[in-house]
Regions:
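Sec-dependent N-terminal signal peptides
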Residues: 4-13
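Eukaryotic scaffold repeat domains enriched in small/polar residues
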Residues: 17-403
Length: 403
């Protein structure tokens, strides 16, 4: 019997013999009141975070968070009767959330506004009163203290979607995808310089200089980069380490039941296996994961289940298993790289430790797990329980260039 299997069996037995309690948050404990609210900044006491778009843990002491600006900090309203809708209808009730941050935050849904921070036609409210476009890139330390704010870049963001550092880049450039601007930004590690922009701002397309609402990035060990493109696009684009366009693949599918290999709708998540160089693509519109070689040759696929399944992103860590965040079921899902389902955890709610709209997640070198949630408008931190079964923890990341 292997040491890993023996440890897993022992841990399972120990948890099974624990008296009382229950398994709410999988193998984790929630770190409450992390990070500090943006309202703690001087003069900002009336505002809180907008929709949580992305999170990336460079280290346990430097965690990047993306928000769609800020929302008014309002206490939960008292329950009231909605007599215009019916005699016994009231809201909010029980533990149900009362404000959906992704609807309330700028720029709203659908296509981008005309300028960064401008609302779309479907957004209802007054800018500066019901939402404001500030503090889109915030960095916290291990204790949740806000240690950096890259407010100088708010003006070039319209809907920041994803943030990460290429794990094979010793200079640790920071990459941010903005799906409404249709571009990918490459910043210096300290955020002082915008070093590269891939894509043409506000001009859609499907080539080496145009995207159609791109969503996520993934890198191979030689820094080859793959772009999931995207909400409206139906392809994967491949670039070399300098940002030179190499090739792309993917054709428009017919959702929600497209079965043809290489046809996609809403390409919203991508991950790579550094050993085999396989590319795992979340074909969100058709509820499946498609697997390709690095040049787009179709290899395999598996279904992510029927409604309410709604996979938002993929991640492959150091243990070479694939984790997916399911916004529809509010669960984290674990698979082997052949698509065999292994484990899941998660609970819906806007209370501390619950999930509501997980749109990004990350793991640091100590195994702490972070989520960014568009609906609840927050980023959360989870700490592994003492003696937690390693097989139930989201794998630590690959950091080969930083060791």
């Amino acid at each position: 019997m292997s040491k890993k299997l023996l440890l897993a069996l022992i841990t399972t037995v120990l948890f099974a013999q624990t008296k009382g309690g229950q398994d709410m948050f999988g193998a984790y404990d929630i770190v409450k009141e992390w990070p500090k609210d943006i309202s703690t900044l001087p003069g900002n006491d009336k505002w809180t975070y907008g929709a949580g778009q992305g999170v990336f843990a460079e280290s346990p002491n430097r965690i990047f968070m993306l928000y769609r600006g800020e929302l008014p900090k309002i206490p939960r309203p008292r329950t009231k009767m909605l007599t215009d809708m019916g005699p016994s209808i009231q809201f909010p009730i029980g533990r149900l959330p009362w404000r959906d941050a992704t609807t309330a935050s700028l720029p709203g849904g659908g296509a981008g506004g005309s300028i960064p921070g401008a609302p779309t036609d479907g957004w209802l409210g007054t800018v500066g009163v019901d939402a404001k476009w500030e503090n889109c890139i915030v960095i916290a330390d291990a204790n949740g203290n806000i240690i950096e704010r890259w407010t100088q870049w708010d003006k070039i963001l319209q809907r920041p979607h994803f943030v990460a550092i290429n794990p094979y880049d010793p200079d640790k450039h920071v990459w941010i995808v903005d799906d409404h601007m249709g571009v990918i930004y490459k910043f210096s590690h300290d955020g002082k310089q915008l070093e590269q922009t891939i894509g043409t701002p506000k001009v859609t397309g499907a080539d080496g200089t145009h995207f159609n609402r791109p969503t996520f990035l993934a890198w191979l060990p030689d820094s080859t980069m793959f772009v999931a493109d995207g909400y409206n696009g139906t392809r994967v684009a491949k670039f070399d380490k300098s940002g030179k366009f190499l090739l792309d693949w993917g054709k428009p599918g017919i959702q929600p039941n497209e079965k043809r290999p290489g046809y996609m709708n809403n390409v919203h998540g991508i991950a790579v296996d550094p050993q085999t160089r396989r590319v795992f693509v979340n074909d969100r519109g058709n509820k499946r994961i498609q697997v390709f070689d690095e040049n787009g040759k179709y290899l395999n696929e598996w279904s992510m289940g029927a409604d309410p399944s709604d996979i938002h992103l993929l991640y492959i860590g150091a243990d070479r298993t694939l984790w997916a965040a399911d916004r529809g079921t509010s669960k984290m899902l674990k698979y082997d790289l052949d698509g065999k389902f292994l484990y899941s955890w998660g609970i819906w709610g806007d209370f501390a430790g619950g999930f509501w709209g997980v749109h990004g997640f990350s793991v640091d070198q100590e195994g702490n797990f972070y989520t960014a949630e568009v609906d609840s408008g927050r980023v959360q931190k989870f700490r592994p329980k003492p003696g937690a079964n390693p097989a139930q923890l989201v794998s630590k990341p690959v950091y080969s260039a930083w060791r």
